């Protein structure tokens, strides 16, 4: 049954929620995120459009190289579904706010947004989801991995020892956890699998913390567990979820044990250095939280100090960060724009994400306009995660890999839960 205001006193009242507040930050965040999302969706509708305008392809044609002729405006396999789904969602939304929907449909929508479950029901539901997930995935632990990076990583972990931590910049936290997994369980994949289970639990508890609704947490958990890209990399040794767990934990700890948040963020970096790029998103999240100002300053300053300390240490020990990251001599605009196309093909099996990312962002903006600050934070996280792919290809010689979209899927799932935080729309 729905919970009450007394049960969750920090939930805004309906009147407070409905009262719109002028918010320049909200508009800026929305414009940023919706722009990134729309550019990313171009390749879902027209897969060849961005690639066809690549200057490299044009240069090859000028040199007489015959390229395969591709129609830049040929629709992708998800194009019709994307347009239809978005049209239906936005029409229903407009009719709802214009009070033109049939009463039965309106009541059904209100029921979904106001529905809540008891702690007991939430515990049973979460436990059932975990049992199903673990039971379906545990068999993968006995299967030898076939990723190309696995052989090299296995050799590196076999030769790893704790005394190497201070000698070179590598993902030593990841090596340590894989080394520990082999030492304790005789299998490299056990602790990575436990990390994925932890990520599922964190998704639930983080969503509940943001929304004050257990039902929202269950919905977010279901969305994550149905994700193809999450299930593809949940037991992998080559592309573990350690970095995502530590990063999401750093955000969660801002509410639960704020002095430990920078520690968790620090651990995410030697799990995968790419989390350094999450730094601006972390600062914005801290800025929009409801903790006291002094706590915000301390957490933000500590997190900033971690980045600065890493840069200073690299300088002192002569570590070439450009070489580590594979940084190019100059920015490659062609590769930058091609980076946006990775969204369409890396997530081609995650139809839920492709079809509803645009309505989700619009929904988050509406929620932020009605006073829910966490909606802005989720927009920044979604937009930032999508922007990382083109930044990587534009500034480094690295290619975009599907596993890098796992944190995006996690925040997509949490964002859906955030929409359900509203008691009534």
Which residues make up each language-model segment?
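Hydrophobic, aromatic-rich transmembrane alpha-helices
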Residues: 199-204, 352-376, 415
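Membrane-interface alpha helices of multi-pass inner-membrane proteins
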Residues: 259-282
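Membrane-interface transmembrane helices that cradle and orient dolichyl/undecaprenyl
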Residues: 247-261
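Membrane-interface helix-loop-helix junctions at transmembrane boundaries of multi-pass membrane enzymes
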Residues: 208-211, 215, 293-299, 363-384, ...
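Short hydrophobic/aromatic helix or loop-helix immediately within or flanking a transmembrane segment
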Residues: 163-186
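Membrane-lumen/periplasm interface segments of specific transmembrane helices
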Residues: 294-364
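Short acidic/glycine- and proline-prone juxtamembrane loop motifs at membrane-interface regions
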Residues: 232-240
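Transmembrane-helix signature of polytopic, membrane-embedded enzymes
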Residues: 203-226, 244-245
């Amino acid at each position: 049954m729905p919970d009450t205001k007394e049960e969750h006193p920090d939930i805004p009242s309906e009147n407070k929620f409905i009262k719109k507040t002028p918010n320049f930050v909200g508009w800026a965040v929305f414009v940023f995120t919706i722009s990134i999302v729309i550019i990313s969706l171009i390749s879902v509708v027209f897969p060849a459009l961005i690639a066809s305008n690549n200057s490299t392809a044009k240069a090859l044609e000028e040199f007489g190289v015959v390229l395969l002729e591709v129609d830049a405006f040929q629709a992708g396999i998800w194009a019709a579904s994307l347009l239809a789904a978005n049209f239906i969602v936005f029409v229903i939304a407009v009719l709802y706010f214009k009070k033109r929907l049939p009463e039965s449909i309106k009541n059904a929508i209100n029921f979904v947004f106001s529905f809540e479950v008891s702690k007991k029901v939430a515990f049973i539901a979460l436990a059932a989801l975990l049992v199903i997930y673990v039971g379906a995935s545990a068999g993968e632990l006995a299967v030898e991995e076939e990723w190309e990076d696995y052989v090299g990583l296995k050799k590196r972990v076999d030769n790893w020892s704790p005394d190497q931590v201070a000698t070179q910049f590598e993902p030593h936290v990841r090596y340590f956890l894989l080394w520990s997994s082999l030492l304790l369980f005789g299998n490299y994949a056990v602790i990575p699998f436990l990390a994925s289970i932890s990520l599922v639990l964190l998704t639930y508890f983080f969503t509940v913390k943001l929304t004050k609704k257990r039902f929202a947490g269950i919905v977010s958990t279901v969305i994550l567990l149905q994700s193809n890209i999450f299930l593809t990399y949940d037991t992998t040794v080559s592309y573990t979820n350690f970095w995502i767990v530590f990063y999401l934990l750093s955000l969660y700890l801002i509410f639960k044990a704020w002095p430990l948040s920078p520690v968790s963020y620090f651990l995410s970096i030697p799990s995968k250095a790419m989390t350094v790029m999450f730094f601006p998103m972390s600062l914005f999240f801290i800025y929009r939280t409801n903790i006291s100002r002094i706590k915000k300053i301390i957490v933000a300053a500590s997190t900033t100090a971690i980045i600065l300390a890493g840069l200073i240490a690299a300088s002192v020990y002569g570590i070439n960060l450009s070489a580590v990251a594979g940084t190019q001599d100059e920015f490659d605009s062609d590769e930058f724009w091609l980076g946006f196309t990775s969204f369409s093909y890396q997530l081609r099996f995650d139809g839920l994400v492709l079809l509803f990312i645009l309505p989700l962002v619009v929904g988050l903006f509406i929620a932020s306009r009605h006073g829910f600050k966490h909606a802005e934070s989720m927009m920044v996280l979604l937009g930032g995660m999508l922007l990382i792919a083109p930044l990587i290809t534009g500034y480094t010689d690295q290619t975009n890999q599907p596993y890098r979209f796992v944190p995006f899927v996690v925040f997509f799932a949490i964002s859906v839960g955030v929409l359900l935080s509203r008691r009534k729309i």
